């Protein structure tokens, strides 16, 4: 039995992007949206992301302009729950187990997950448990520029930034039933393709639980600035406050 081949699935990637831009003498805008999806190489392994961006600049008056920039993304990642991996995203130990699992024992007999000799079935461990992570990010920037009319060369700038980040992780571990089949041979090491079931075994190394973790952060900054730039003859004067 080639356990890696049985677990492997051909991955697929889908990506779509749409953008619009335009404007007039007083206003300019750019908007875009994106979709990205990738199916994994194993069960319970996939990734989906939605993203958007909007930039609008408007000249409210001859000496006053404002801008609004908004971007964000929403992603959903799903991986098998494998308690032996310290890094759930890389799954190094799961790959190692698939490549090194003994090939002498069939994975399934008559459609039933087999665990006659080695007491567990790595394919069922992958199928029965997952980790799902949802990430949402929102960035907003509001800016304004005022060219002060009664002082030539003096401009006032203001910028407000807001960022919000949301993360929700859910781990699901399920117990599952494996089947012990009749063996033959001098060392009871042979399992026929049509071997009858002689017992069952319930595996709980994935636990039997649901755990949720939630994290949300937000931050904002406000910058106020005065700039003075003016030329007197051959001399340039600049200052920032």
Regions found by a protein language model. Give the residues of each.
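Surface-exposed loop/interface segments of Gram-negative outer-membrane beta-barrel transport/assembly proteins
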Residues: 1, 40-47, 51-139, 155-241
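Acidic/polar N-terminal loop/beta-strand segments that form early-domain functional surfaces
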Residues: 23, 32-34, 71, 147, ...
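Outer-membrane beta-barrel channels and translocator barrels
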Residues: 13, 24-25, 61, 147-151, ...
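Residues embedded in well-ordered regular secondary structure
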Residues: 1-44, 81-84
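Outer-membrane beta-barrel architecture
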Residues: 19-21, 32, 55, 141-145, ...
């Amino acid at each position: 039995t080639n356990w890696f081949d049985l677990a492997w699935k051909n991955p697929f990637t889908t990506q779509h992007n749409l953008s619009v831009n335009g404007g007039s003498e007083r206003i300019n805008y750019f908007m875009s949206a994106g979709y990205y999806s990738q199916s994994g190489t194993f069960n319970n392994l996939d990734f989906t992301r939605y993203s958007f961006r909007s930039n609008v600049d408007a000249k409210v008056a001859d000496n006053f302009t404002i801008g609004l920039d908004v971007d964000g993304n929403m992603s959903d990642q799903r991986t098998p729950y494998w308690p032996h991996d310290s890094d759930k995203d890389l799954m190094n130990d799961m790959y190692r187990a698939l490549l090194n699992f003994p090939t002498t024992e069939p994975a399934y007999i008559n459609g039933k997950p087999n665990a006659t000799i080695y007491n567990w079935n790595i394919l069922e461990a992958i199928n029965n448990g997952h980790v799902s992570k949802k990430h949402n990010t929102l960035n907003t920037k509001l800016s304004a520029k005022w060219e002060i009319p009664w002082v030539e060369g003096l401009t006032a700038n203001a910028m407000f930034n807001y960022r919000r980040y949301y993360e929700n992780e859910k781990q699901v571990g399920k117990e599952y039933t494996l089947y012990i089949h009749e063996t033959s041979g001098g060392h009871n090491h042979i399992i026929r393709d049509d071997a009858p079931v002689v017992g069952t075994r319930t595996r709980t190394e994935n636990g039997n639980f649901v755990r949720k973790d939630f994290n949300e952060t937000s931050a904002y900054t406000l910058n106020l600035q005065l700039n003075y730039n003016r030329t007197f003859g051959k001399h340039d004067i600049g200052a920032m406050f």
